[in-house]
A protein has these predicted regions:
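Aromatic- and carboxylate-lined catalytic core of secreted/periplasmic carbohydrate-active enzymes
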Residues: 72-76, 84-86, 99, 103-218
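Substrate-binding/catalytic cleft of secreted carbohydrate-active enzymes
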Residues: 1-107
């Protein structure tokens, strides 16, 4: 940072951690990131030190909450959520793959929880995978090349979240779970709410019935 004042700097932590754990007061760090990782609910993989409650692996919104608890408050985003078409948990090629609706959920959950943006990833694009080359994640010979992956639905849907956020006053928007009247759901039934001065948005992944406190906006 001392030799380059013109570029933003951050730190990419390991899975299930936020950079604020180590660098909350670092002056060189312009914004925080966390890595919610690639595991599905209940996919703990061993008994090593685990920094999150069991069965919360997909709840990337909780990292936004925990990062905002550090002072001074800085912008934050999910630098590595689950990637489209990558095996759940990364390393078992026989696992199910993360789909477009999964990466969409991660994006909306994170942004509505208060992230300043989001990171999209794709198994093939991450590796710039070409025919004839081995893959790091998945089954060799069965993976699409990166230029075909550019047509995948998750890749082409991220623009809708960006356009939505930029269509509204960006700097007045705040996360506000008090909009959810009554009990909120868990896992895929979790509602995430955000608002500005005269609008509110709620992400409802499973289309569950919901009650909202509309007094939160003028």
């Amino acid at each position: 940072k001392s030799i380059d004042h013109n570029h933003l700097m951050t730190y990419h932590p390991r899975g299930r951690y936020t950079s604020a754990k180590w660098w909350s007061k670092a002056k060189w760090l312009d914004f925080h990131t966390f890595q919610s990782g690639h595991r599905k609910y209940g996919q703990r993989m061993g008994n090593k030190d685990y920094p999150i409650p069991d069965n919360t692996e997909e709840d990337n919104w909780m990292y936004v909450d925990s990062t905002w608890a550090y002072k001074p408050i800085k912008p934050v985003l999910d630098a590595e959520p689950s990637y489209e078409d990558i095996p759940k948990g990364l390393h078992d090629p026989n696992e199910e793959r993360w789909q477009d609706y999964d990466v969409r959920r991660y994006a909306y959950w994170s942004v509505f929880a208060g992230s300043c943006g989001h990171t999209y990833g794709h198994n093939a694009i991450m590796q710039m995978l070409k025919p004839g080359y081995p893959t790091s994640y998945g089954s060799d010979g069965a993976e699409k090349p990166w230029y075909v992956a550019l047509n995948d639905p998750g890749f082409n849907q991220m623009k809708h979240l960006k356009n939505l956020m930029l269509s509204l006053p960006y700097f007045e928007r705040v996360p506000d779970q008090s909009i959810i009247a009554g009990e909120n759901g868990e896992r895929y039934n979790r509602l995430l709410a955000t608002r500005g001065n005269d609008y509110l948005l709620v992400y409802n992944y499973n289309c569950v019935p919901m009650k909202l406190d509309l007094r939160k906006v003028s």
